[in-house]
Amino acid sequence: MTELKAKGPRAPHVAGSPSSPKVGSPLPCSQAAGPFPGSQTSDTLPEASALPISLDGLLFPRICQGQDPTDEKTQDQQSLSDVZGAYSRVEATRGAGGSSSRPPEKDSGLLDSVLDTLWEPSGPGQSQPSPPACEVTSSWCLFGPELPEDPPAAPATQRVLSPLMSRSGGKAGDSSGMAAAHKVLPRGLSPSRQLLLPTSGSPHWSGAPVKPSPQPAAVEVEEEDGSESEDSAGPLLKGKPRALGGAAAGGGVAAVPPGAAAGGLSLVPKEDSRFSAPRVALVEQDAPMAPGRSPLATTVTDFIHVPILPLSHALLAARTRQLLEDESYDGGAGAASAFAPPRSSPSASSTPVPGGDFPDCAYAPEAEPKDDAYPLYGDFQPPALKIKEEEEGAEASARSPRSYLVAGASPAAFPDFPLGPPPSLPPRAPPPRPGEAAVTAAPASASVSSASSSGSTLECILYKAEGAPSQQGQFAPPPCKAPGAGGCLLPRDSLPSTSASAAATAAGAAPGLYPALGLNGLPQLGYQAAVLKEGLPQVYPPYLNYLRPDSEASQSPQYSFESLPQKICLICGDEASGCHYGVLTCGSCKVFFKRAMEGQHNYLCAGRNDCIVDKIRRKNCPACRLRKCCQAGMVLGGRKFKKFNKVRVMRALDAVALPQPVGIPNENQALSQRFTFSPSQDIQLIPPLINLLLSIEPDVIFAGHDNTKPDTSSSLLTSLNQLGERQLLSVVKWSKSLPGFRNLHIDDQITLIQYSWMSLMVFGLGWRSYKHVSGQMLYFAPDLILNEQRMKESSFYSLCLTMWQIPQEFVKLQVSQEEFLCMKVLLLLNTIPLEGLRSQTQFEEMRSSYIRELIKAIGLRQKGVVSSSQRFYQLTKLLDNLHDLVKQLHLYCLNTFIQSRALSVEFPEMMSEVIAAQLPKILAGMVKPLLFHKK
C-alpha cells in the first residue's frame, strides 16, 4: 500500500468562523440527484459536532443543505471506491444543513488534507463531548443492560486513552479520529453494512414519525444494497427507531453545538422482514460526553470488539433464531444485578470495566428491556442462563472474561489491547474451561435451566480454590485465590499467554485461566458470547473438552495409584524389580541369591538365626538372608517352569471359600512364630496351605478282598476294580475340598478328574507302599497287600513291576509328606485337553500356586540352596515320568475292560463310564500332558 503523507500543516479550524468549515460541519457537495427518492431535510439543524474530524471528507463526505441522505449514500460509495486499504465501507450520515467548504475530489489533495487532520491530536483548549467511559474499555456495546450515567467517567476515559494520543500540538477533536484509525471494523459487517445517521427531520425508515430536535436520533446498521430504495417494501432493515423510556426520553439531539450535551449511543435490535435475526440500531441517550470524542468515533472504536469473522447472514440469522427460541429476557433488577457490576455508588458505576460482560448502553436504567434485545453476534443469555453453545477454541480465549462476584477472589480480567489496565477492577474470575457454562454468583434468581443441565458430564468445575468456598451447582464458577495470592490456583501452562495478561499480572490482577489472545497480531477480540464455532480458529487443542474432572479422577482406578498392587520384594521389602528364580524380589536379593547358590557358601548366623532382613539391614546377616530366600521359594530351577506357572505375587489359597468350614491358620501368625535354623536341626514351620492339604487327605480305604480264599486273576482284578471305584469317589470328594479347584468351571473339574484318576491312584499306591512297608511290597489297601510272590502268581506281574517303581523312587528320594501332598495336587492338574479348558486362566493360576507350595515344602527340609534346586528337579522329573507309567496302566485297563466278560472281571458302574469315555481319548493322544522338563 502506498504510504500517504501530509503536505504540510494547515491552519487550525476556528469554531464559529464563517469562511472555514467548522469542526464536524458537513462538507458541501453538488445537488446531483441520487438513485433513491429523497426525503425532506431540515435547514435549521445546528452543526454536527459529533462527526469525527478524522473521518471528515474521507469516509463521511459533507453534504449540502437539503440534500437527501440517500444522495449522500450514493456519493459516499463513489468516494469510498477511491480509497484503498479500508477495512470496511461504513457511511455515517448526519443531519443535512450547514455551509460547504469544498466538494469531494478524487485527487491526492483531498487525501493529504484529510490526513493532516487525521494525525493531529486535540489541543488543550478545544474539546468536544464524548460518550460514557464504559464504551471505551468494555466490550462491544451490543452487550449491556444499562448505561452508567455518572459524569466522572470522562476523566477515567481520558486516562485510558492517553496512550493513543501520542502526538503533540494537535487540533480539537482529532483524538477521536486517532482512536478510530487504530481500530479495525469487523469483517462481518463489511462491506454490506453502513452506519446511516438520519436527521431528526427526515426519518430513514418507512412509516417513521417526524421527531422534534430534542428527540434522540438513531443510527441503524443497514445492508448496502443499491438496487432497493429505502422507501420500498423490501429493505433489509425495516421498522421504527426505538426510543427508550426513562431518562432517555428527553435525551439529546443528533447534532448539537460544541457546548451542548449529547446522549450516548445505545444499541436496540430490530426485526428484519426476511430474516428472524435482529438488526441493530444505535440510539442516542442522555449521558455526558467526555471532551475530545464524538459519538461516531466511539461507535467505530467499540466495533473493534466484534469478531473479525466471515460469517454469512444466513448462518447468523439461523443462529440468532435458535437463541431467541428460548425464554424471553426478563430484565429488571435481577438482570441488572446478574449481568452488570453493582451500582451502589457513583464511583462504582463510573469505573470502567474492561472486558466486562455487558456494558450499560443497551437501554435506560428505568426502561423495560425489549423481548428481542439480543445482539446479532453471540449468545446473549437471559438470567436463566440457557447456555446452549460450548465455548471452545479462540472464542473462549479471545473474548473478555465474564465477571463473577466471588467473595475473596482476586480480579482476573484483562483490558483490551492496547489500552492499559484501569485503576480498579471489580472481582471477577474466568470461565472454568472451554465448553463449560458459567453462572454468576451474585443474583439469587439466576438458575440453570433444563437446557443447560442436559450437558455432558464434562461440564463441571476443574479448578477449585483452597480459600474461597465453591458455589453450589453443577456449573458453578471456579473461584481464584485470595487477593494478593497471585495467579489462579491451577494455571494452564499449555495455553499461550499475551502481553496483556502479563501486564495485568504485573499490575496486581491475577491472570485468568484462559487469558485473552490476540490472533495474528490483531487486537484482542472482546466480544462477550459464543459465535458460530465453524468460523473460529482452533487455538486450544481439541482435547481440552475431554479433560476429566478432579472428582471423577479421584474415584477412577485409572487415576488412583493407591488401588494398584504395590510390588514389594518378598525378602527385604524393597521395591521389586521382577520375578527372579520363581519369587518376586528386588535386584539386590536376586544377585545375592545367585552368588550364594553358585559359590556354595556356608553362611553362619552370629545370632539365633532370627535376624531381621529388611532394606537397611539385609547385608548384616547373609545366613538369615539366604534362609529367607529359600523359605520364599527361590530356586535355580524356577526359570525352567516359569513358562508353565506364570509366576505372580505369592497368593494364599487358603482365602478361597471351601465347601465345608476348615480351620485355616493365619499366615501372618505362622510367619510371626519364632523358628530356629541350624545345620543339625530342621525348620519347624509348615505353610498353612500344606497344613490344609494334610487335613483334607482321605482316610484309609479298604478293598474288600477276601484273603481267606486262594488268589485268582479274576478275584484280584475284581477286588482292584472295587478299590478303584472307592478311590475314585474319594478323589472327587478330595478335589472338591481342594483350595482353588472349585473356582474352575464344572466341566473342567470333571475333565481333570477323569484324566487324572489313574495317576492319583497309582501315586497314592506308591506313597502307601513307601510309608507302610518301605517300598518292599505293593500296599493297595490294608486288606490287599501284594508281595513279590503274590505278584508273580497274578496275571499282571509285569504291570505290578511297573507300579513298583514309584515306591522305590520314594524310598530313593525320601519324599516328605508335605512334598507328597503338593505333588499329588500337581498330578490332578497334570493333563488337560488339547483345546484347553474353559477356565484356563484360573487353572494356570492354581497350578502355579501349588508349584510354589512344592518349592516351600522342599525348603522346609533342605539345608542348602543347591540341594533344594536339585530336589525340585528330581521331584518334578518324577512327575513327568508318571505320564509314561500311567499310559501303560491305561492300556491294560482298557484291554481288561473290553475282555471283562471273557475274563470274568467285574467293573463298577462309575469306573466303567470313565474307562469307556476317556481312556480311548487318552490313548489316542487327544490330551495334552503338562511337563516340567523337556524330554
From Swiss-Prot:
Q: Which SMART domains match?
A: HOLI, ZnF_C4
Q: Where is the NR LBD domain?
A: 681-915
Motif LXXL motif 1, chain ranges? 55-59
Renumbered zinc finger spans (NR C4-type): 569-589, 605-629
Compositionally biased intervals (Pro residues): 418-434
Composition bias (Acidic residues) maps to 220-231
Q: Name one Pfam family in it.
A: zf-C4
Q: Where is this region: AF1?
A: 456-548
Superkingdom: Eukaryota
Establish whether keyword Nucleotidyltransferase is in the entry.
no
Stretches for region Mediates transcriptional transrepression: 165-305
Instruction: Give the region (AF2) as residue ranges.
Output: 689-935
Q: What GO cellular component is one of the record's annotations?
A: cytoplasm
Q: Where is this cross-link: Glycyl lysine isopeptide (Lys-Gly) (interchain with G-Cter in SUMO)?
A: K388, K533
Modulating, Pro-Rich as annotated region, ranges: 1-568
Segments of this protein annotated with the region AF3: 1-164
The entry's family comment says: Belongs to the nuclear hormone receptor family.
Quaternary structure, per UniProt, is: Interacts with SMARD1 and UNC45A. Interacts with CUEDC2; the interaction promotes ubiquitination, decreases sumoylation, and represses transcriptional activity. Interacts with PIAS3; the interaction promotes sumoylation of PR in a hormone-dependent manner, inhibits DNA-binding, and alters nuclear export. Interacts with SP1; the interaction requires ligand-induced phosphorylation on Ser-344 by ERK1/2-MAPK. Interacts with PRMT2. Interacts with NCOA2 and NCOA1. Interacts with KLF9. Interacts with GTF2B.
Q: Read off the domain note.
A: Composed of three domains: a modulating N-terminal domain, a DNA-binding domain and a C-terminal ligand-binding domain.
Role noted for this protein: The steroid hormones and their receptors are involved in the regulation of eukaryotic gene expression and affect cellular proliferation and differentiation in target tissues. Transcriptional activator of several progesteron-dependent promoters in a variety of cell types. Involved in activation of SRC-dependent MAPK signaling on hormone stimulation.
The molecule here is called Progesterone receptor
Which taxonomic lineage does the organism of this UniProt entry have?
Eukaryota, Metazoa, Chordata, Craniata, Vertebrata
The gene name reads PGR
